[in-house]
Amino acid sequence: MTADLSSPRRARRSPSSYLGALVGKTIRRSIPTAIAFFVLLGIWQLLCSGENAACRPIQVVQESWDLIIDPFYRGSGTDQGLFWQIAASLQRVAVGYLMAAIAGIALGILIGVSVLMFQALDPIFQVLRTVPPLAWLPISLAAFRDSQPAAIFVIFITAIWPIIINTAVGVQNIPQDYNNVARVLKLSRLDYFLKVLLPATVPYIFTGLKIAIGLSWLAIVAAEMLTGGVGIGFFIWDAYNSGSNSEVILAIIYVGLVGLLLNALVGFIASRVVPDEQK
């Protein structure tokens, strides 16, 4: 008697079973986060359990309930719901971040491929990147005479440095074997850029972009506290001046969640662009 050694054909999974497995996997991954969240809430409640303690979790929800249930409220001037406050901040971040990405990648490649440019510009970049973001705000206000472009400039000058540095490091770390093959094949500069330099540098570029998006969101919240207008930063500052600590805490939570989503968005794009063997 001979045994049938042929492997059984794998049954094709239905869309419903695949969706169920995905949901189950997501729930299992979320359990530790949920436990940590409730532990932090408990610690928060205990720390604010004195007779005169303020800003208990329940109190924050009660006092800021209108902002929670109506984020799309539209009033006059800066009297806007949290959705519009965050949207205004995100708009400034998007413009400044996009400008920083374009300029940062270009400059990073330039100083990465040219030893002379690296020696000339790297010391300047190292000095400028240590300047705190808000230190640029008075200069930008004096130059642009408007809070909107001034805030965008602060985003730009904050986000550009990690992009430049990581891109340059990526170019400098291209394996020498790649360059040797390019010389043997006599690739043109354009072909070398598209087929060798860019693919090898993409992981480093996205590392810089991921760092930059977090710094951009951090900087715009701080800058808006000084520039005013519609934006989550000025909302926090205005709530503080009004003595509404619950609104301040709620806004801080929203800021953290948006920052998490921005970081996840850049990470998701990187997972689709960066080849698996380079991750």
From Swiss-Prot:
Show the GO MF annotations: nitrate transmembrane transporter activity
Q: Which InterPro entries match?
A: MetI-like, MetI-like_sf, NtrB
* GO cellular component terms, semicolon-separated: plasma membrane
Q: Which GO terms describe its biological process?
A: monoatomic ion transport; nitrate assimilation
Q: Which residues form the ABC transmembrane type-1 domain?
A: 86-270
Q: Does the keyword section mention Cell inner membrane?
A: yes
Q: What PROSITE patterns does its record include?
A: ABC_TM1
Membrane topology reported for the UniProt record: Multi-pass membrane protein
Source species, domain of life:
Bacteria
Q: Which UniProt keywords apply?
A: Cell inner membrane, Cell membrane, Ion transport, Membrane, Nitrate assimilation, Transmembrane, Transmembrane helix, Transport
Annotated SUPFAM superfamilies: MetI-like (SSF161098)
Q: Does the keyword Cell membrane apply?
A: yes
Q: Where in the cell is it found?
A: Cell inner membrane
Give TM segment ranges: 98-118, 124-144, 151-171, 196-216, 217-237, 249-269
- Note one Pfam family from the annotation: BPD_transp_1
Chief subcellular location: membrane
Q: What does the similarity note say?
A: Belongs to the binding-protein-dependent transport system permease family. CysTW subfamily.
SUBUNIT field = The complex is composed of two ATP-binding proteins (NrtC and NrtD), two transmembrane proteins (NrtB) and a solute-binding protein (NrtA).
> What does this gene product do?
Part of the ABC transporter complex NrtABCD involved in nitrate uptake. The complex is probably also involved in nitrite transport. Probably responsible for the translocation of the substrate across the membrane.
The record's annotation in NCBIfam families points to: ntrB
Q: What is this protein called?
A: Nitrate import permease protein NrtB
